[in-house]
Amino acid sequence: MNKTILIGRLTKDPELKYIPNTGTATCNFTLAVDRRFKKEGQQEADFIPIVVWGKQAESTANYMSKGKLMGVSGRIQTRSYDAKDGTRRYVTEVVAEEVKFLEWGKDSNIENVDFGVPVQEDITPVDNSDIPF
C-alpha cells in the first residue's frame, strides 16, 4: 500500500506547466508540514515536494498561493533524470490524487487568521419543566 495524507502550507506560489504535445497540465509546489514533536522548543517542519496533474493542477495554480493551508492525499513516487552536468539525479515526491483547499484566495492575509481559538456556541438554557417525559 502506498498512500500519504498531508496538511501543510505552500512554501511558494505553485508552478503551472503544460506538457508539450499533450497539453496536460502539471503543477509543482512544496508543502511545509509541521512535525508532531518540537525539538528544543522549536517546531520543526518537513518540506515535501508535490506534483498535481490535470484539472486539479490548474485549480491549484489559480486558487492557491504561498502560505495557504491545503490538504493533499496521494502516493509517494521516486523518479530519476539526467542532469545537465551528466549525473543521474533521483527525486522523491508525492503525486497528488486529491487536493483540498483549506484556505482560499491568492490575496487574503493569513496573518489575521487565528486557528487556535475555539468557536463559541450560543447555548440558550432550556426549561426542563415543559418536557413531557
UniProtKB/Swiss-Prot annotation:
Residues 1-103 form the SSB domain. It comes from the Bacteria. GO terms for cellular component: nucleoid. InterPro entries: NA-bd_OB-fold (IPR012340), Primosome_PriB/ssb (IPR000424), ssDNA-bd (IPR011344). SUPFAM superfamilies: Nucleic acid-binding proteins. The keyword Amino-acid biosynthesis does not apply. One of its GO terms (molecular function) is single-stranded DNA binding. CDD domains: SSB_OBF. Keywords: DNA-binding. GO terms for biological process: DNA replication. Pfam families: SSB. Disulfide bonds: none annotated. Homotetramer. HAMAP family: SSB. NCBIfam families: ssb. This is Single-stranded DNA-binding protein 2. It comes from Clostridium acetobutylicum (strain ATCC 824 / DSM 792 / JCM 1419 / IAM 19013 / LMG 5710 / NBRC 13948 / NRRL B-527 / VKM B-1787 / 2291 / W). The lineage of its organism: Bacteria, Bacillati, Bacillota, Clostridia, Eubacteriales. The gene is ssb2.
